[in-house]
Amino acid sequence: MRTPQLALLQVFFLVFPDGVRPQPSSSPSGAVPTSLELQRGTDGGTLQSPSEATATRPAVPGLPTVVPTLVTPSAPGNRTVDLFPVLPICVCDLTPGACDINCCCDRDCYLLHPRTVFSFCLPGSVRSSSWVCVDNSVIFRSNSPFPSRVFMDSNGIRQFCVHVNNSNLNYFQKLQKVNATNFQALAAEFGGESFTSTFQTQSPPSFYRAGDPILTYFPKWSVISLLRQPAGVGAGGLCAESNPAGFLESKSTTCTRFFKNLASSCTLDSALNAASYYNFTVLKVPRSMTDPQNMEFQVPVILTSQANAPLLAGNTCQNVVSQVTYEIETNGTFGIQKVSVSLGQTNLTVEPGASLQQHFILRFRAFQQSTAASLTSPRSGNPGYIVGKPLLALTDDISYSMTLLQSQGNGSCSVKRHEVQFGVNAISGCKLRLKKADCSHLQQEIYQTLHGRPRPEYVAIFGNADPAQKGGWTRILNRHCSISAINCTSCCLIPVSLEIQVLWAYVGLLSNPQAHVSGVRFLYQCQSIQDSQQVTEVSLTTLVNFVDITQKPQPPRGQPKMDWKWPFDFFPFKVAFSRGVFSQKCSVSPILILCLLLLGVLNLETM
């Protein structure tokens, strides 16, 4: 006997023949909906197609013909089911207080059925719907609590589809409101243990790692600080003092300083004083922080260039720092072993809005025990030059990159110079402010400005040239201005342009050519000025020109092949044809011979 509770079960009764399975679909795309064959069940709580209600279903083999009686509760009252309800967050509602066209979720449109008004709905303005469809012919009766429809697909087959509430397809959902009434319940469901921070004293690492800030120590004040490498920030490239130098990170930075009152900043600003860049020590390893006064862990900063204190002389601030170059030698986990610094200084004119461009260079290299060992420098190729790598120059067994002039923001010559890149033609220029001096000193100053300090004497033939091996370097040819070319005894001939001509070529195998320098020449162009002329500045130009003189060999060619062939009359059947036209005419025709043979046979038969 059935219990009353079983009568309350709501059944979704589907009859499927063998081998038929429902196919889920996110949307019945391509299917054109027919008239809405959706009917809410009456007291029976079933959804039935009108055409299927009157039709008599034939018996399906293998299935019982007697359908069990389904007892279901009454369906809820009749109400309109909105298959595309308005989203809680309308992403296309861009105009407050006005209706956005084709935005089906815009509440300002006041449309009950926006699909009937708009030609289409913008993406994200309607809920994405998920449908599960099967062939309509296999459905006998449906009392699904979800909305259902019958669609006609592109092949004309009716599909029975059930709309499933799939919240995963709709990403914009209303967040649950949290108030005093439901807070405890939500906290019990979603709450967890809070994280409490515990202060733990960590000992400094035993050695530097790449990128770690470098520690410094000021014995005079017993203060531990960091080695700074000011860098430019913003559109104007203002100097940021807080930029730390990273361990094993060789790089260069440039920044600009502006002074409201250079007369007072000349001697008070530590950034202009050379002593502020070497009056401290560097800690070998980070663990030296625990005992910074131990001289065993301190590395003094060695000054390798002449540096004078800033001095305000009249309207000029002399000996201000314009370039700082640190050379740091490291020895793996043993830390920093040696630190040296070289400074470049210049003079500034005290004027409103004065500025100074500073250049900071930081180089790391492996520590060498032997002082006689040559300084290692980066290669520009191995062995041949690589396009874009620096052109290597040599002066007094010191290898460095050849450079060109570089101008500051106001057009004056900067202490910083452009590197000459192999295979890249370049030109640069600037204005040099001249001091009152005799002609020889003026010429010497301009020559040094054009080719840089020190003056290049040799150029590396290959990119991996060793400074100790003179055979791997070629001497630079110089062509100075001819003094006899001018007919003026009271004139001074000064250089105004330097052209660096580099002849290079590819050598080696065609499959792996190597670029090498064949020769370099410095070509100066000069102009004469009167000694009586008060020239305050002169425009200088430097350019480099690479000329490819590669002579490519002839492409390889194979040996001539023998023309092997049989003689024309090799086959005996062609002997007659190989005797020429005359012999063919004199030969007996095969047809005539055949006729004679037939005539002889006939005569024999008649006898």
Swiss-Prot record:
Where does it primarily localize? membrane
Where are glycans found on this sequence? N78, N179, N347
Membrane side Extracellular: residue ranges: 23-581
Secretion signal span: 1-22
Q: Does the keyword Mitochondrion apply?
A: no
Region Disordered, annotated ranges = 21-60
Q: Where is the composition biased (Polar residues)?
A: 45-54
Q: Where in the cell is it found?
A: Membrane
What InterPro entries does the record point to? Tectonic, Tectonic_dom
Residues assigned to the Cytoplasmic compartment are: 603-607
Q: Which UniProt keywords apply?
A: Apoptosis, Ciliopathy, Cilium biogenesis/degradation, Disease variant, Glycoprotein, Joubert syndrome, Membrane, Signal, Transmembrane, Transmembrane helix
Q: How does it sit in the membrane?
A: Single-pass type I membrane protein
Transmembrane ranges, per UniProt, are: 582-602
Q: What does this protein do?
A: Part of the tectonic-like complex which is required for tissue-specific ciliogenesis and may regulate ciliary membrane composition. May be involved in apoptosis regulation. Necessary for signal transduction through the sonic hedgehog (Shh) signaling pathway.
Q: Which family does it belong to?
A: Belongs to the tectonic family.
Q: Which disease is it linked to?
A: Orofaciodigital syndrome 4: A form of orofaciodigital syndrome, a group of heterogeneous disorders characterized by malformations of the oral cavity, face and digits, and associated phenotypic abnormalities that lead to the delineation of various subtypes. OFD4 patients have tongue nodules, multiple frenulae, broad flat nose, hypertelorism, and short rib polydactyly with tibial dysplasia (Majewski syndrome). The presence of severe tibial aplasia differentiates OFD4 from OFD1.
Protein's recorded name? Tectonic-3
Q: Native species of this protein?
A: Homo sapiens (Human)
